[in-house]
From Swiss-Prot:
Gene Ontology biological process: biotin biosynthetic process
Pathways per UniProt: Cofactor biosynthesis; biotin biosynthesis
Identification of the protein by name: Pimeloyl-[acyl-carrier protein] methyl ester esterase
Active site per the UniProt annotation: 90 (nucleophile), 216, 244
Main function: The physiological role of BioH is to remove the methyl group introduced by BioC when the pimeloyl moiety is complete. It allows to synthesize pimeloyl-ACP via the fatty acid synthetic pathway through the hydrolysis of the ester bonds of pimeloyl-ACP esters.
Reactions that this protein is recorded to catalyse: 6-carboxyhexanoyl-[ACP] methyl ester + H2O = 6-carboxyhexanoyl-[ACP] + methanol + H(+)
C-alpha cells in the first residue's frame, strides 16, 4: 500500500507561497489571512504529517538530534512547488529553515513567523522554555487533548493586546478539523525538544524575513533579535503588543510585510 500524500490546499494566482503551520495545529489556523494572501500569491497551505487533513499521512519518524525529522522534511519536499517562498509559523518556521538549506534551488525566500532556533532553554540559550514544562504539557495532551489544547491556545495569545478577540477565533479554527494523530504529536514533541538550529542559520543564503510579536511567550522576542544577527540577508518586523499569532492579531501588518518582501 502506497504512502498517503500530504493534504495541500492551493488557491490564488501569482508567485508561489507555501504556508507551514506549527505543532499540533493545521493549515486552517491561518484563518482569514489565507484569502487575503491569495489575492497576491498562488498559495499552498500544507497540513503536516498526521495533522488536519493529513491525518493518514504516516508513518512519522522521530526527531533527529539537532535537526527537524528527516521524514517531515522529505514529505514536504514532495509537495513543494519550484521557485517558491516558504512562510513557516513556530515549528513550521524551523521546517522552513531546513527546507531552505536542503532545497536552495527551489526555495527563493523564507519568512519565519514566531520562530526560534530552539524552543527549549539550554545551558547557553536562555530564551526558551523549560524542558520539564514541555514534557508535562505533552503528558497532559495525551490524557486530555481538548482541555490541554485550549490551555495551549491561551498561552499562544498571552501578551497580545487583543487576546480576548483572538482566543475564541483560534479555538473555532482549531476544532474545525480532527485532532492530530497521537504519533504525530509525539514526533512533533521530540522535534521541539531536540531541535537546536543555531549553528545552521549562517548557512542560509536566501533572503529571510522575521515576523515576531514583541510579547511572544513561546518564541521569545530576544530569540528573533538574536537570529537577526545570524542570517546573511535578513529583515525583522517586530510587532508591538503582539503575541505568538501575529497573522490573527495584526493580519493587515502581517500581510503587508509579506507582500512587500515576497512579491
Amino acid at each position: 500500500m502506497g504512502q498517503v500524500s500530504l493534504y495541500v490546499e492551493s488557491l490564488g494566482e501569482g508567485p508561489d507561497l507555501v504556508l507551514l503551520h506549527g505543532w499540533a495545529m493545521h493549515s486552517g489556523m491561518w484563518g482569514s489571512t489565507r484569502r487575503s494572501l491569495a489575492q497576491h500569491f498562488r498559495l499552498h497551505l500544507v497540513d503536516l504529517p498526521g495533522h488536519g487533513f493529513s491525518r493518514g499521512a504516516l508513518p512519522y519518524k522521530r526527531g533527529e538530534k539537532n535537526g527537524v525529522s528527516e521524514d517531515m522534511v522529505e514529505r514536504v519536499v514532495e509537495v513543494l512547488p519550484p521557485d517558491c517562498v516558504i512562510c513557516g509559523w513556530s515549528l513550521g518556521g524551523q521546517l522552513a529553515i531546513e527546507l531552505a538549506l536542503r532545497e536552495p534551488a527551489r526555495v527563493e525566500k523564507i519568512i519565519l513567523t514566531s520562530t526560534t532556533p530552539s524552543f527549549v532553554k539550554r545551558e547557553d540559550w536562555q530564551w526558551g522554555m523549560e524542558e520539564l514544562t514541555l514534557k508535562a504539557f505533552a503528558e497532559n495532551l495525551r490524557r486530555d487533548f481538548s482541555t490541554t489544547m485550549k490551555r495551549f491556545l491561551t498561552l499562544q495569545v498571552s501578551g497580545g493586546g487583543d487576546a480576548g478577540k483572538v482566543l475564541p477565533e483560534m479555538r473555532r479554527l482549531l476544532f474545525e478539523r480532527s485532532a492530530p494523530e497521537p504519533e504525530a504529536l509525539e514526533a512533533g514533541l521530540q522535534i521541539v525538544l531536540a531541535n537546536d538550529l543555531r549553528g545552521k542559520l549562517r548557512n542560509i543564503v536566501q533572503p529571510t524575513l522575521l515576523i515576531h510579536g514583541e510579547n511572544d511567550v513561546i518564541a521569545h522576542p530576544e530569540a528573533a533579535a538574536w537570529m537577526k544577527q545570524q542570517f546573511q540577508d535578513v529583515e525583522l518586523a517586530m510587532l508591538p503588543n503582539c503575541s505568538h499569532v501575529p497573522f490573527l492579531s495584526y493580519p493587515d501588518k502581517f500581510i503587508a510585510n509579506i507582500v512587500r518582501f515576497a512579491r
